[in-house]
Structure formats: C-alpha cells, structure tokens
C-alpha cells in the first residue's frame, strides 16, 4: 500500500489544474511528509543521553498587517543582506524570509505561486521568518531562544533606532564613503586647545602697549619642586615675585622682547595623548620620586625665590632679638634646650 501511495500522489499532482491552489498545497504537503518518513503521526521523544542532533524550526510572523507601510524585509536584510547574515552568525541558526511579499518582483512572485512547485509553496502563507536549528536538544532550544530574542528588535517599526542608524552608516561606507565620516577621529597633533599647554596669545595692555606672550606651561601631572626655577621658556610667576600688573606700565617706546623659541617636544603633550602611557609614566614617576627621596636642604622647601639661604634667616632673627647689628649673638642658652631637672631653678 505504501509503495503505491507515493506514485498516486505524484500522478494526482500532475493532473491538477494550477488554479486549484489549495488542492496542490495539500498534495505537496502530503508528498513531503511521506518522503521524510513522517507519514505516521507518532509521538516524538527527545533523547538527552545520546545527545543526538535534532532539527528545530519555528515560524515568526512579521507584523505587516498592523504596519503595512513599514519595510520590515529591508530592515531584516540590511545593506546587501549583511544584517541577516550577521544575525544568523550570532545566533548560529538559519533564517529565511518566506511568505507573501518576500520577493521584490510581485509579478514573478505571483507566477511562482501559481506554478504549484513545492519549493514555492510558502508564497501562499503570510509573511514570516523561518528559523531553523540543527543541534543537540539543549543547544537547539538555547539557540532558538537567542534567535527569537534578537529578531524581535528587527520587528519594531522604528526608522531612527540603533539598527537603522547602523545600517545607514554601513550603506554610506559601502557606497564609497567613510565609515566614520560624521565623527572623524584624528590622533596626534590636534588643532584644539591642548590640555596643560597654554596657547600664546598677544593681548593689549594698558596704554596701548602689547603685553608679553604667555609662557608655555608645564603639562599637567608633572610637579615641579618649590624654589626651583623652570628652565623651559621664560620664568613664570611664583611666590614672592611681583606680578606683571604690579610692576607698572612699560614706557611708550618700550618694545617687548622676541618670543622664546617654541620647543617641538611640547607636541607630545597634546590633548589626544593626555591619557596615553607617556603621560602616565612621567606623572607617576615624578610623584614617586618626590615622595620617596628626602629633601637635600631646607632651601628646597623654604626658598620662595628671594635668593636667601638659611644663614640670612638666622642673622635676621639674632638682630631682631639683640637690637644691635655689630655685636656677636649672646651665648645664652635657649629655652628649648634639654635639662636634666625640669623643675630646677636657674
């Protein structure tokens, strides 16, 4: 009986007129089930011990009836079909857009639908995405769940979401443009104001005389010891020194000195490289040295640019107490000297 069943189905299919679409659909489905050995409707079991690969398929409906003006097929495919390819690679599944409206040429789609061939039978169904998985049972259902979660993002009728913006950027890149044409990334020397380096600007001072150009500062993160003058460029304002405003206005015939030569080595401290390894190494090394190495003399901490040492401070103190410049300091012991008997009298 089974040997004659398949030839009878094939003969009946050939005798049917193409206008009987539903009859052809039922015959094709029966032929497909018989060829796959699914003629008997028997309950299927999953053997997780052997862990044999199983085939899992699911149809996902595309909401074209609710949103007829939105191009879901174009959003699913993406530029040159790359979006659907990446989605299949990420979920490890096979996806196919099937159903009515899945082909661009509507006339050809109608012709293939009326042809009655089994491979074009899906054109009679609603527009959907067929997800197929071939893997062990647990892995198959995990992949299917991942695919259903990811494909849901493509079925939202939004023209300005992240997926659409990425597709437009990819389309621009494929058409010959740059992938990052909207926001160019340029590392190295930047035209913007750099961090830690002041741009030399010439300003008008009081009396109409041009002031001196601003000195180039030390990059951020590199501390300088107190009392030590920087050798880079002109001397900047420090503690104890008069500000340029307090020095008075220069005479009318005064000419400012030529600006100092610009050092090319400052180019490495621009904004883009501010968080690079060079910046970190210099800043952390300088901080480690300043906290680990003890001070060599008191002038490193107490000399604020006056040019005075420890002797000058000592002589000034003695003159204040003795009220005489030419007498030797008194040999009287200071009160802070250690005594054997703290409560003894003088």
Swiss-Prot record:
Region (Disordered): 212-268, 320-346
Region (Involved in homodimerization): 1-160
PTM notes: Phosphorylated on tyrosine residues.
Residues joined by cross-link Glycyl lysine isopeptide (Lys-Gly) (interchain with G-Cter in SUMO2): 4
Biological process per Gene Ontology, one example term: regulation of mRNA splicing, via spliceosome
A GO molecular-function annotation: single-stranded RNA binding
Record InterPro entries: BBP-like (IPR045071), KH_1_KHDC4/BBP-like (IPR055256), KH_dom (IPR004087), KH_dom_type_1_sf (IPR036612), Qua1_dom (IPR032571), Sam68-YY (IPR032335)
Expressed in which tissues: Ubiquitous. Highly expressed in brain, heart, testis and in Sertoli cells at all stages of spermatogenesis. Expressed in neurons. Detected in cortical layers of the forebrain and in the CA1 to CA4 regions of the hippocampus.
Stretches assigned to the KH domain: 61-127
GO CC annotation terms, alphabetical: nucleoplasm; nucleus; protein-containing complex
Binding partners and assembly: Self-associates to form homooligomers; dimerization increases RNA affinity. Interacts with KHDRBS1/SAM68 and KHDRBS2/SLM-1; heterooligomer formation of KHDRBS family proteins may modulate RNA substrate specificity. Interacts with the splicing regulatory proteins SFRS9, SAFB and YTHDC1. Interacts with HNRPL. Interacts with RBMX, RBMY1A1, p85 subunit of PI3-kinase, SERPINB5.
Protein family according to the UniProt entry: Belongs to the KHDRBS family.
Domain comment quoted from the record: The proline-rich site binds the SH3 domain of the p85 subunit of PI3-kinase.
Official protein name in the record: KH domain-containing, RNA-binding, signal transduction-associated protein 3
Organism listed in the record: Rattus norvegicus
Lineage: Eukaryota, Metazoa, Chordata, Craniata, Vertebrata
């Amino acid at each position: 009986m089974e040997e004659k069943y398949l030839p009878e189905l094939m003969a009946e299919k050939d005798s049917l007129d193409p206008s009987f679409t539903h009859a052809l659909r039922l015959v094709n489905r029966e032929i497909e089930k018989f060829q796959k050995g699914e003629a008997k409707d028997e309950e299927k079991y999953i053997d997780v011990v052997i862990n044999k690969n199983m085939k899992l398929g699911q149809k996902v409906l595309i909401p074209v009836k609710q949103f007829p003006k939105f191009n879901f097929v174009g959003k699913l495919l993406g530029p040159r079909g790359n979006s659907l390819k990446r989605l299949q690679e990420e979920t490890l599944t096979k996806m196919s857009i099937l159903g009515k409206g899945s082909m661009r040429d509507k006339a050809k789609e109608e012709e293939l639908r009326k042809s009655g061939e089994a491979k074009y039978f899906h054109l009679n169904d609603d527009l959907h995405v067929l997800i197929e998985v071939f893997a062990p049972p647990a892995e198959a259902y995990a992949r299917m769940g991942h695919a259903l979660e990811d494909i849901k993002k493509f079925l939202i009728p939004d023209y300005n979401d992240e997926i659409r913006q990425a597709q437009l950027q990819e389309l621009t890149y494929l058409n010959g443009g740059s992938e990052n044409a909207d926001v160019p990334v340029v590392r190295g020397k930047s035209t913007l104001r750099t961090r830690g380096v002041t741009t030399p600007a010439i300003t008008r001072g009081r009396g109409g005389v041009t002031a001196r150009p601003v000195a180039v500062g030390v990059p951020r993160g590199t501390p300088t010891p107190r009392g030590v003058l920087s050798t880079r460029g002109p001397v900047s304002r420090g503690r104890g020194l008069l500000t340029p405003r307090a020095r008075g206005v220069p005479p009318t015939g005064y000419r400012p000195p030529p600006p100092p030569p610009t050092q090319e080595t400052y180019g490495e401290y621009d904004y883009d490289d501010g968080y690079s390894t060079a910046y970190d190494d210099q800043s952390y090394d300088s901080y480690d040295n300043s906290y680990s190495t003890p001070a060599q003399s008191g002038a490193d901490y107490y000399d604020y640019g006056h040019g005075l040492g420890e002797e000058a401070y000592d002589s000034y103190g003695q003159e204040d107490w003795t009220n005489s410049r030419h007498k030797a300091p008194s040999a009287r012991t200071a009160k802070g000297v250690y005594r054997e008997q703290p409560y003894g009298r003088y």
